[in-house]
Structure formats: structure tokens, C-alpha cells
Amino acid sequence: MIRDEQGSMSAFLAMLFLVFLLLISVCVEGIYMYTARGKAMGIYMSGLSHTKGNYQKELADMYHIYAMDPRYHKKIEIDFSDRMKESLDQNGDPFRFQTGSTKISDILDLSAQKGEVLKYQIRQQMQYEAAGDILKNLTKKIKAGEDQKNELSGIKDQIQKEEEEAEETENEKTLTSEPVKKDPRKGFMKLLKEGSVPLIMGEKKVSDLPINIVYGKKDTTKQSAWNFMNRKDVEKELDEFEKTASTDSFASELPVVLYATKYFHFLTDTTKKDGIKYEIEYLIAGKDSEKENLGMVFWRMIALRFVMNAVCVYQDPAKEKEAALLAASILGVTGFPPAVAVAKNLLLLALAYGESVIDVRNLADGKKIPAVKTSSDWQLSFAGLATLNCKRKPVNQGMSYEDYLLLLLISQKDKRQKYFRMMDLMEQNIRRKVSDFKLDQCISSYKISQNLKLKKLGFGGMILPFATYTDLKMYRYVTY
């Protein structure tokens, strides 16, 4: 009995030792697996850094936008797998990994998600560059424009009131003792019909390169010259202007407009550039030729200035009196109060529009103009309206051509278009260096998966827990 008890005790201790050994082996196996996974992840992350470094160089150098080079996309899976093997060999792999398949998926290119991918990168880049003083300065300028735009309805009400008062005395024909004068609006209208580019640039050379529109939407609208001989036509133009987009959301659009002025060329930019010259003008106008884009931007700048100048001219009693006398003189013996009132207001509006043309000429020459004018800042007289000849009065402190480009960019109705048009410009400019470059092949975000096999730890020739290899699958989302 004693021997049996001793044998049972020995067997029990042996089993206890075996259980203890198994527990130790499981713990060691767990530590081994944990360490191996950490090692594999470190090598995997090193491979990710390598792949992320294969970005499109020209895109990064010219625009500070990062995306995978399309040429690398074709070989990324093989390259990543080879990189993993190389790193394992160089680091003296004690875990005896076996590399499996590499797969890239969930790809987003720079043109994806309706421009949101490009927008995200621009915002990330510009978030520290929208300094407080820039924001404050722009806010002040935009507010001045918005305040005067709001006064446009007041001008329309004043015109209507004057004409109604004149109609009450329409039977009292008023003859003028002065000789009949030539209507300056006729000469002015002739100049307007020539188009905004010759009106502003004169004989200066203007680029007319074509723009290849791939991502953006071509703007097919046309700008016609205002007819200051017809009241209804002018009223229609005033109504259309009131419908233009507001700049209420300018804070949210500020990063992209600052990015645009930093990385894209425009008329008064003094830096030399090959290829497209009026890039920001294209972002605004969306035409397929440089000259058309410049012309459309000129018309829109004239319209912006017109509102401010109209407010100024209607606040000047001397100009109102001069316009009334000129209207009566133009109409001569056929003049009567309603017609004189209409002609007077059309003359005042024509003068404000002519002054706006002079303003844009100053802007196109790289000079500044006052945001809000007074009578002392005024340049054009009724005598010079037909030929637009006057002494210009640019200022040192005021708004520049670039400032008005910012206003036009911010006030775009379809705010996504500026991103698509940026894509067009980026692609066309980079193609001067890389002929087959396509922006929609540049990958901004992707998922990369890697399969590995890990040889399990063995004890005395026995593999625990009874399988030679275990599968490891690693993946990460990569975003530039």
C-alpha cells in the first residue's frame, strides 16, 4: 500500500509538473506572439512610410498637394511585399516570417467626392496661413462692398420716386433756352460694345491660350453691354445684380481663395510664368480661352464697382443737378418732366458705370482704388463720358486687382467649381513637364493589406498548440 501511495504521488506530481509546463509554454507562446506581432507591425509601418514617400513630385513642388504617383500605383503591391521581405532579412528575422499577398483597396483619387478630397488638403495646408490681420482686412473690405450693395435698392426707389413726381407734371412741357447738346451716352455705348478687354486693356497684348476643361464645368453665359439709352434694360440689369451670390460664407471660403492667390497666376502678378497666365480668372469665369476669362472678370469687376459708384453719384447734389440740366439740354424742345427725369437717371447711372470702367483700368495696371468713393476721388465727368478720357486718381491705400479677385472667388454661386477648375489648371500645367499626367489617377487615400505567416514556437521538437504557422493580417488606411 505504501508503494502504491508513493506511485500515485509521483504520477500526480508528474501531471502537475506537466500542467505547469503547459501553462508556462502558453505564456511563453503568448509573449512570443505579442513580440512577433510588434516586430511585424514595425516592419509594416516602415513599408507604409516607403510607399507614402512615392508621391507625385511635380504636383507637390508646384502646388504642395500630395498624392501617390500614378506610375508607382502600378507596382505598389509588388514593391510593398518586396520591401517587407527586404526589411525582415536585414533585421535578422528570428521569427521566421513568411510574407503573403499584398492588396491595395478603397482607393480615392484627388478628383473624388465632388472636390472634397482636394478641398481637404487645401484646408489642411492653409489653416495656419489665414492670419488674423488678413481676415480682419478682408472682412472690412467685404463689408464695405456688401453695405453699398444693399443700398442699390435705395437707388432704385429714388429713381422710381423721381419719375413718379415728374409724371404728375408731364403736361407742363419745359423748353430749354440752352442749345441742344450731344448725348454722351451714345459714344459711351459704342465703346462698351467693343468688349471689356479692349475697353480696359486698349492696345496691350493679351494672352489667348486655350484651356483644356476636363473636371470643371464650362461657363456658357455671355455678358452684354448695358444699354443706358433704355430704362427697362437698365432696370433689368439692376435686378440681375441684386441676385448675385452673397459673401456671407466668406470665412469658410477664405482658405481656398488664399491658396488660389498663392499658387495660381493672375493678370497683375509680376512673377514670370510659362503657359496659362490668367489662372484665377479661369477659376472665376470658367471659359475655355484666356481672353474670354479675362473679359468676363473685367465685366464682373465693373459691375462690383458700379454699385459703389452709383451710391456715390446719387449722394452728390452737384452731379444730380448737372445731370438734370444735361438731360433737358439733350432732349431740347421735346423735353418734358417724365422724359427729363428718366434721362437724368440714365445719365447718372452711365456716369457711374463709366467711372467703374476707369476704376478697373487702374486695377488692371496694378494700382489701387478706394473701396468707397467721395466726390474728391471721382475721376470721370459728363464731358469725358463719350470717350472715357479723364485724369485718373489711383490711391496708395485701397483695394487692388487681387482683392477684387478674392471677392469674386468668394461670391461664386457654385462654390465647388473653383476646386474642379483648379484640377484643370494643375493637370494642364504639370503636363508641360509630365506629358501623360492625369490628376484623377493620383491617389490621395487608400487601404493597404499585408498577409504574413508566423512560425509558432516549438518546445523540444513539439509545436504548441499543434500548428506550424499562424496567419497575421495587417492593414492600415493611408491618407496624404
Predicted regions and their residues:
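Long, compositionally biased low-complexity segments
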Residues: 65-480
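Alpha-helical assembly-interface signal, strongest on the long, hydrophobic N-terminal helix that forms
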Residues: 1-78
